[in-house]
């Protein structure tokens, strides 16, 4: 909104307030006299006859007046026409030059930004002068900042007359007095009033008055009681729940390790499922996702992932790819080594079976692959006995390859012959039962008894002297049927009974095995063959141990007694206990 008025009165009129509440200001307070214009005496003064209100200001109408004003020396002197402008309208109607600069519509001064133009309008064309309120001060301020800055000068207290001299004397005294490195009264008072004790720490005070909390279990120390309490919690073993998964961990340290391994990199997804498009951090989480209830039934998921492979389209980063390649290389190496060991075991087994030359027809011969052997160190499997150390504790030397090969063959023969008398007791004590009878007994009892545990028995304080039961030694209608009877009573031998003592059965020779195939010893021919082989293998091992003992005695120049009726060979055998060697 703009208004134009004509006046000849040199005195500045008061601001005009319109009916709608807008305030209008006069920008010039004096008349400008042009050189060609008549003097004030010649021109009669004009009165303010009309005051009209128009629409938005059109700068083309007053362009000539603005140019005339800018040519004059004083920026505040205008022609007879004075432009009265509203403050809001002045800020809204801003002219922009073609080069992008802003210029004032009153004084035609260019500015680079709209902010600088606004500051110019408020500072020069719309400012309100205010005088200082202090008596005797004629300072005029045009902005609020100038007024506040000037008021601070009156608020400052006046210094005393001797303040400067006192400051100089105080500085000299402070330089002369030696400063002690001890806390002052204020620091000691704060320490006594606001000190806190933390269990598990030692509280000390430094020279500067700070409180130090030292841990009793580690050299860690802090200056904050809260941090000290958090550190002491790390040494406690109280169970704590994980915030993310709810898993219970023992202590804060274990909980932090769980977080670092599981939840730290949850935001970084490296493995992507091709079915549900979920991403996982590690291969364990990814396989757990795939091996869900419906994972094996989903045709879109490759089933080879259950065997260590990743499905097609899986996004894997470089580090994880290198780890997978190294893991697969190790799997190939382990697979190759396993094949070599299996081939070697197959060759040894075929060689032993060929040497035994046992022809039992259609019956199944017990090979002793799962048998337990009684050793001085307890029950051992055939593979553990086979892989014993090559170091000989008697002579302190290592055996040669030829001796080791012979020893391994003899041990393989011994594996095929478990404890003789245990199988004989099982044959004579256990009644003949069929699969149907066993099922009926299980249905009547409605519970299953756990199998016998083989190993150290804490009740008797030693290893029980028995071996696992072979399938061929059980009396059954057909040799091919193999079933486990959970109700079979475990038979323990007496401790004073020699497990390797030969019985009254006929001992067959390895060269005359075929002669006993047609014979009828016991309840089953196949079981008698195994019993005879066990007896032969046990006797061979006893003879070998006797030879080794006599060789050691010969080295010590030990003279055996003469062969007469009063010899003490039996006493010597009891001393060395040849029969208990297994």
UniProtKB/Swiss-Prot annotation:
One of its GO terms (cellular component) is nucleus. It comes from the Eukaryota. Residues 1-21 are annotated as: Disordered. GO terms for biological process: regulation of transcription by RNA polymerase II. One of its GO terms (molecular function) is DNA-binding transcription factor activity, RNA polymerase II-specific. Transmembrane segments: none annotated. It is found in: Nucleus. Keywords: DNA-binding, Metal-binding, Nucleus, Repeat, Zinc, Zinc-finger. A zinc finger (C2H2-type) spans 102-125, 130-154, 213-235. This is Heterogeneous nuclear ribonucleoprotein C homolog. The lineage of its organism: Eukaryota, Metazoa, Ecdysozoa, Nematoda, Chromadorea. The gene is hrpc-1.
